[in-house]
Regions:
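Nucleotide-activated donor-dependent transferases that construct or modify glycoconjugates
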Residues: 1-9
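A cross-family phosphate/adenosyl-ligand binding-site feature
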Residues: 3, 19-90, 96-97
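Short glycine-rich anion-binding loops that position phosphate/pyrophosphate groups of nucleotides
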Residues: 9, 38, 81-82, 106-109, ...
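Hydrophobic/aromatic ligand-binding patch that stacks against planar heteroaromatic rings
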Residues: 22, 123-128
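Glycine/threonine-rich flexible loop motifs
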Residues: 109-118
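Glycine-rich phosphate/pyrophosphate-binding loops
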Residues: 128-153
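Electrostatically charged, flexible surface regions
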Residues: 149-272
Length: 272
């Protein structure tokens, strides 16, 4: 199966490369197309683009990963956000359209409310619109204090999130069409993983944005860890406790709801 592998951290991210290796390991063909720059927090946006009529695409060899025939895996560095990359893949921009999308491995958690803003999850939800199943994969890399960047210095345990994703992928291939999963794993050695749990979304995400200053020309922002207490069965709490969490995500859909339509019509002067 041709599987789109993308992210929002950019084509050079080691997390992306680890996820590509996981796709190869389970016998599928990775179609690697990821942003040429960091699009973290892009959600499912399709822009802005420098040129609305053209998207830049450059070849990029994925380091340390070879395909089943031993040849290097060559991907695409794309001047676009991840959701648009999913759309371009569906349009045949990187060869025959893929049948599935996996996104990540994100540097930092995508739990709770953060799922709304995540470009990693946005890429997967965009793929669902094209009939694909998909999985967003994130590693709970801590926030560095005072820098506004996610990711502590030193080694990140990409291999843990990649190993869990590799186990789940065969199931996802056989799952009903348009199944969307959100996987978060702790940033810890695989031997220390507590296990894999279903989890609900926490009331808030694992990280949050704060305003640290303001003046006449703008606002200063920073990204900090969210130390609020979370429900025990939530994704944020379980990942903090050393579990990998899997949360099926519902795509955008209308809800059945009783609305005061007649009252609104009367208010705008339309009465039968």
């Amino acid at each position: 199966m041709r599987i789109l592998v993308t992210n929002d951290d950019g084509i050079t991210s080691p997390g992306l490369h680890a996820l590509v290796a996981a796709v190869v390991a389970v016998g599928h063909e990775p179609i690697v197309a990821a942003p040429s720059t960091d699009w973290s927090g892009a959600s499912a946006c399709l822009g802005p683009l420098d040129d609305q009529d053209r998207v830049s695409v450059d070849r990029f060899q994925i380091p340390g990963v070879v395909s089943a025939d031993g040849s290097p895996v060559v991907g695409h560095a794309v001047g676009a956000p991840p959701a648009l990359i999913s759309m371009l893949a569906d349009l045949g921009g990187f060869g025959p359209p893929p049948a599935m999308v996996v996104a990540g491995i994100n540097r930092g958690p995508n739990t709770g409310r953060s799922t709304l803003f995540s470009g990693t999850i946005g890429a997967v939800l965009a793929g669902e619109r094209f009939g694909w199943s998909g999985m967003a994969v994130s590693a709970d890399v801590p926030v560095t204090g005072g820098t506004g960047a996610v990711g502590a210095p030193g080694h990140v345990h990409w291999e843990t999130a990649a190993a869990v994703a590799q186990v789940i992928l065969p199931w996802l291939v056989d799952a009903p069409q348009r199944t969307v999963l959100n996987l978060n794993a702790p940033d810890a050695p695989l031997a220390e993983l507590q296990g894999i749990r279903w989890a609900g979304l926490a009331p808030v995400g694992g990280v949050r944005t704060v305003v640290t200053g303001r003046d006449d020309t703008g606002l200063d922002l920073d990204l900090v860890s969210n130390d609020e207490s979370m429900p025990d069965d939530s994704d944020t709490a379980l990942v903090r406790a050393g579990w990998a969490t899997v949360t099926p995500i519902a795509p955008t859909a209308a809800l059945e709801m009783e609305l005061p339509l007649a009252e609104w019509e009367r208010a705008v002067g339309r009465e039968d």
